Amino acid sequence: MELDIKGIMDRLPHRYPMLLIDRVLEMVPGKSIVAIKNVSINEPFFTGHFPHHPVMPGVLIVEAMAQASALFSFTDENGGLKCDGAKTAYYLVGIDGARFRKPVVPGDQLRLEVEAERLSCTICKYQGRALVDGQLVAEAKLMCAIRSLEE
């Protein structure tokens, strides 16, 4: 299953400048996702990180992995939504083993590959990898909490 930016925005509450997924190339709901972030010099974080040598902050690469994980966790087997995004919050609550191997710079296309390790109604665990031109630039284990906003 693929998603364009409209499908992504239908599923994620994030908006500019915090929406860090541009396209979904492959998605197996509840199992895995491959998504793309096109890194442009126009990203607001490049203004201060760093003006003379722009590098995408590692924490935003991890956030992009978390957003990718939310996309496939909230999509059912038929491509529909499992929950009402307006009534559900998805929080990044843990990061283990994060490693940043190479800098991500303007002009790079960040390929995000995330696999589910454990999914439940309240806590989910994932293994995420980020690649540029087939080379590993970052990896991390993620833990996310799902909460109803009506509680």
From Swiss-Prot:
Q: What is this protein called?
A: 3-hydroxyacyl-[acyl-carrier-protein] dehydratase FabZ
Which keywords belong to this entry?
Cytoplasm, Lipid A biosynthesis, Lipid biosynthesis, Lipid metabolism, Lyase
The gene name reads fabZ
Query: Catalyses which reaction?
Result: a (3R)-hydroxyacyl-[ACP] = a (2E)-enoyl-[ACP] + H2O
Origin organism is: Bordetella parapertussis (strain 12822 / ATCC BAA-587 / NCTC 13253)
Give GO terms: molecular function aspect only: (3R)-hydroxyacyl-[acyl-carrier-protein] dehydratase activity
Where's it found, cell-wise? Answer: Cytoplasm
Highest taxon listed in the record's lineage = Bacteria
Name the CDD domains for this protein.
FabZ (cd01288)
* InterPro entries per UniProt: FabA_FabZ, FabZ, HotDog_dom_sf
Key word Lyase present: yes
Q: Which GO terms describe its biological process?
A: fatty acid biosynthetic process; lipid A biosynthetic process
